[in-house]
From Swiss-Prot:
N6-(pyridoxal phosphate)lysine: modified positions: K210
Gene source species: Schizosaccharomyces pombe (strain 972 / ATCC 24843)
Gene of this entry: met17
Cofactor(s) of this protein: pyridoxal 5'-phosphate
Cell cycle in keyword set: no
TM ranges: none
Record PANTHER family: HOMOCYSTEINE/CYSTEINE SYNTHASE (PTHR43797), HOMOCYSTEINE_CYSTEINE SYNTHASE (PTHR43797:SF2)
E.C. numbers: 2.5.1.49
GO function term, MF aspect, one: pyridoxal phosphate binding
Protein keywords: Amino-acid biosynthesis, Cytoplasm, Methionine biosynthesis, Nucleus, Pyridoxal phosphate, Transferase
Annotated InterPro entries: Cys/Met-Metab_PyrdxlP-dep_enz (IPR000277), Cys_met_metab_PP (IPR054542), OAc-hSer/O-AcSer_sulfhydrylase (IPR006235), PyrdxlP-dep_Trfase (IPR015424), PyrdxlP-dep_Trfase_major (IPR015421), PyrdxlP-dep_Trfase_small (IPR015422)
Localisation: Cytoplasm; Nucleus
Oligomer status and interactors: Homotetramer.
Summary of pH dependence: Optimum pH is 8.
Name of protein: Homocysteine synthase
Length: 429
């Protein structure tokens, strides 16, 4: 029977699934199939014409992915979701469903390095430009919106600045201009720490590779449509949702799909044509991660806060950045929006500058030095020399990256062991 609970802990286990009708399997099966049998020619025609819901081809939809999509949509308070092959593919398809050559997006400069590079280098090759705003002040973002802007973009917890945007004010200025707010909520832990849609976001993306999967075993992403943006009211800015579509014999998406016009366009146009779909085997691993997400996030944020407070008092540490600390620039907004903890990632710099910070990273034993976050294990990296290496020095500063910055994605090991590892590294470096 359908789950009616609003509790995150229950939804992460049950939303989007009923036991398999044919086998009564309690676990979500892996549907390793490319395609699905039509009852007859007319049935196949109705499916291809989007006149009837159902499965056609696994590049667009898959029963295993369908459970994951419904579960994430429930956890994020969205109306629909699309599973993708990675977080980057989720972001790329989420944006290119909205924007075409000649359009732009307005974005904070506080971004993950891969996203910054996508916006700066790859999207311009398609004729889509980005207006970068230094910081995330709502008025500064609003000032950059013009008639060709298709989205305002921020991260729920910036990587690696850990700024927390004022979602409600940013949504207000974006909506006043008829523009949707898109939020990457990867650092929000699948909606456990914050649900941007509750605060005005229209589209949410995730790298499900991170805390959703939680074990460093597979790559995946997801796009969530709030179902709240009025595409019909803003038809001049978004004609593709409001005019006859040449690929579907003149179908008008807002008339056929109403508030889910964006989600259907993303699936039946962008996902179909780009091919960034999620693999059912990978989705199965993501579903395993989802089942313990709240439990892991509790330990992640508990450990991160404890490590941040330890490092803040350490005589060999120059500075610490973590939203839970009163010294952090976003502490007040973090208290407002992050109701289940201040995040699972922190940064710090060692006294002695960049060379000393690099020595500390190299001296760590328990923590793994690699390019990922959200694993159950503690992970570290020096972003200036890795994830943000492609940025110029000026761009690194605008993204919140300094040469001495050590990023720590705090795991769920015993906190005494985590602290002991950093203590010995700071001592021997």
């Amino acid at each position: 029977m359908p789950v009616e609970s609003e509790h995150f802990e229950t939804l992460q286990l049950h939303a989007g699934q009923e036991p398999d009708a044919a086998t009564s399997s309690r676990a979500v099966p892996i549907y390793a199939t490319t395609s699905y049998v039509f009852r007859d020619c007319d049935h196949g025609g109705r499916l291809f014409g989007l006149q009837e819901p159902g499965y056609i081809y696994s590049r667009m939809m898959n029963p295993t992915a369908d459970v994951f999509e419904k579960r994430i949509a429930a956890l994020e308070h969205g109306a629909a979701a699309i599973a993708t092959s990675s977080g980057t593919s989720a972001l790329f398809m989420a944006l290119t469903t909205l924007a075409k050559a000649g359009d732009n997006i307005v974005s904070t400069s506080y971004l993950y390095g891969g996203t910054y590079n996508l916006f700066k280098v790859t999207l311009p090759r398609l004729g889509i430009t980005t207006k970068f705003v230094n910081g995330d002040d709502p008025n500064d973002l609003a000032a950059q919106i013009d008639e060709n802007t298709k989205a305002v973009y921020v991260e729920s917890i910036g990587n690696p600045m850990y700024n927390v945007p004022d979602f409600e004010r940013i949504a207000e200025v974006a909506h006043a201009a008829g523009v949707p707010l898109m939020v990457d909520n990867t650092f929000g832990g699948g909606g456990y720490l914050v649900r941007p849609i509750d605060h005005g976001a229209d589209i949410v993306t995730h790298s499900a590779t991170k805390w959703i999967g939680g074990h460093g075993t597979t790559i995946g992403g997801v796009i969530v449509d709030s179902g709240k943006f009025d595409w019909k009211k803003n038809s001049k800015r978004f004609p593709e949702f409001n005019e006859p579509h040449p690929g579907y014999h003149g179908m008008v998406f807002t008339e056929t799909f109403g508030n889910l016009a964006y989600a259907f366009a993303c699936r039946t146009q962008t996902l179909r044509d780009v091919g960034g779909n999620a693999n059912p085997f990978g989705v199965f691993l993501l579903l395993q991660g989802l089942e313990t997400l709240s439990l892991r996030m509790e330990r992640h944020v508990q450990n991160a806060f404890a490590l941040a407070k330890y490092l803040e008092k350490h005589p060999k540490v120059n500075w610490v950045s973590y939203p839970g600390l009163e010294s952090h620039v976003s502490h007040k907004l973090a208290k407002k929006y992050l109701k289940n903890g201040y995040g699972a990632v922190l940064s710090f710099g060692a006294k002695g500058g960049p060379d000393q910070s690099r020595k500390v990273v190299n001296a760590l034993k328990l923590a793994s030095q690699l390019a990922n976050v959200g694993d159950a294990k503690t992970l570290v990296i020096a972003p200036a020399y890795t994830t943000h290496l492609q940025l110029t020095d000026e761009e690194q500063i605008s993204a919140g990256v300094t040469k001495d910055l050590i990023r720590v994605a705090v795991g769920i090991e015993h906190i005494d062991d985590i602290i002991a590892d950093f203590a010995q590294a700071l001592e021997v470096a």
